[in-house]
Amino acid sequence: MGAIDSGNTAWILTSASLVFLMTPGVAFFYGGMVRAKAVLNMLMLEAAALSVTMIIWTLWGWSIAYAGSDIGGIFGDPASGFLLKDSMVAQDGVFTATGLNGNNYPVSVDVAFQVAFAMITVGLICGAIAERVKYSTWMIFVALWVTFDYAPMAHMVWNGGLLSAGGAISKAIGAAAHDFAGGTVVHINAAVAALIIVLIIGKRKGFGTQPFRPHNVPFVMLGAFLLWFGWFGFNAGSAFAANGTAGYAWVSISAAAAAAMLSWGFTEKIRSGHYTAMGAASGMVAGLVAITPAADVVSPLWAIVMGAIAGVLTCLACGLKFKFGYDDSLDVVGVHGVGGFTGTILIGFFGEGTGLLAGGDWKQLVVQLVIAFVAILYSAVITAIIAFALEKTIGWRVTEAQEVGGIDLADQGERAYDFAGTASSVLKEVK
């Protein structure tokens, strides 16, 4: 085994920690958007995304995605890296790395980085199903979905599989598919899964007739800022080295996020006459989503343009749920689906040296379209099978009475805010 590059190792471990922070960030982002009677349940759904994913990744998820030999371009052998046996070994009673990846940091460090990606992908789905699903069903779904959807998708895109730069689709078209940090694997995948579950479990009581206002907009803003901060590890860490590409990714994601926040705000101002804090938070995230697959291959100008386009499109897309009648509670489809698809496709226009407007030809656009649609199809089919099976066996939803009374009390037996208890204590002190 060669010498460990301590700089790269430290950077990837730092990036893994930043990406891990994104799931608590999205917990606050979504937690502020729900009504007060459902905020604890949302935080618990995100906690399950962290915990269950970690267990599955340790057991066989890592092996399916990255450790095992390729099986049909779709997944790896789940046994070869079972319990991370390929990534660490005991020496004198202390576990250490068994090998190095291409940038000379231990495989175990890559395990840490990649599991954080799996966690946030699962965590994004929660927003669509807020306020009505059972915690127990969600935990089972996470275990199955990471196994049969996320891990194979990561293998297909990032480990030489069907949708990778060297995969069968890229070879057939004659252009290398590009997804730097998760336009397909994370955002399109999560959004499609969210939509499928929503269509199976149905709408919240009062959808379309009652206003579902966020109960804590400062939580939403805090979550958005934490997500932006975590995104530095999410994208800059995807350079897999402490190098210039990592530095440039930091710049491009911030440029896109800033542009999207502004363009979302301008769109809102035209439509409703206000620049809202909710819009600013959502716009930031939309820009971050759109630049994710392209952060290393678009110029600063195109990063700003991509962010601006994404801000407008995602803002408009969030209203589609009312037109088509699907209850995507917190706009996972509008922000992550439309944003992820937009970013993936715009590489075909703006990708340096390959995009139509950046010195390339039509092939890059074609391959980006194909991998996006294959990702949509795979996620839709796998999620539909899992979600439908759960619906027909243990069921997804709490009862209508529990939903109306508040899922926090029904599922967690707690309230986030004990206003009655506080008022009672104050009255006693006054007396």
Language model: regions and residue ranges:
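Glycine- and aromatic-enriched membrane alpha-helices
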Residues: 1-431
